[in-house]
Amino acid sequence: MPQSATDVQPQNALSPAVYIVGAGPGAPDLITVRGQRLLSQADVVLYANSLVPTELLADVRPEAEQIGTANLTLEQIVELMVDRVRSQQSVVRLHDGDPSLYSALYEQGRALAAAEIPFEVVPGVSAFQAAAATLQTELTVPQQVQSIILTRISGRTQVPDAEELGALAAHRASLCLYLSARHVENAQARLLEHYPADMLIAICYRVGWPDEKIWQVPLAQMAAKTHTERLIRTTLYLISPALAAHQQADGSRSQLYRPSHSHLFRPQNQPTPRKPG
């Protein structure tokens, strides 16, 4: 098991280690408090400058080394991290979104562990969460949909056969489709095998950035709208019965909050708290 940076961290200081931090979708105020603290204390910051806005670096110390990694290979990035930590420096590796999704965390973690470099992972808000918040939409609407699938369509990197988009779409869950704008015709065809053509979906571009745009269109228009807006990257698709459910007054609600349901923290017939004074 890789050593955690916190296992060797002196009080009130960052130890020489790598801190892999999720920056969130783009808005500087959507990074976690822990992530912001690590950024403000690090000796070195390696950030994906093609996906992370420079505003997120506002609190980085002036003397800290800042390295954009958009033009670097994974091997070069790992070499930099290992070199700086062995030079007794603390390193923040700043990723867009959440490190657990499409971030090369697996490869970086293995390489750091092999080099006996301690590292810590700090989660971030993902684009699907930020998009749902902008849409004021819950993706798990009672009696409508209770599962969320995060996936992508096969492109340069193939997905396993069991995870082909058509197979996942058969569940008709809330499906969050990443990294697929360049293959949108194929994606739409696979989705139409299982979802209604007139079901509203959301096309989300540069979620969390100042130029964020979100369009809601019928599924049958997903590819056409993508081409009209010339979207080829930083695009997320939300395909979910929940989007339509939020525009309907069908009475769907959670059993947990019904007055007739009691549990450990809310006995039945619990009175509503009164306003103080």
PLM region descriptions:
Residues 1-122, 235:
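Class I S-adenosyl-L-methionine
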Residues 31-33, 130-133, 187-188:
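Short hydrophobic alpha-helical segments that form membrane-spanning helices or hydrophobic packing faces
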Residues 98-171, 215-216:
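Class I SAM-dependent methyltransferase SAM-binding "motif I" and its flanking Rossmann-like core
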Residues 34-38, 60-63, 108-111, 137, ...:
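Short, solvent-exposed amphipathic alpha-helical segments in soluble enzyme
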Residues 53-54, 74-75, 126-130, 147-150, ...:
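Short gly/pro/ser/thr-enriched loop/turn and capping motifs at secondary-structure boundaries
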Residues 2-3, 7, 16-18, 76, ...:
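A contiguous loop/helix-start segment that scaffolds small-molecule binding in enzyme catalytic cores
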Residues 10-11, 36, 58, 83, ...:
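Short secondary-structure boundary/capping segments
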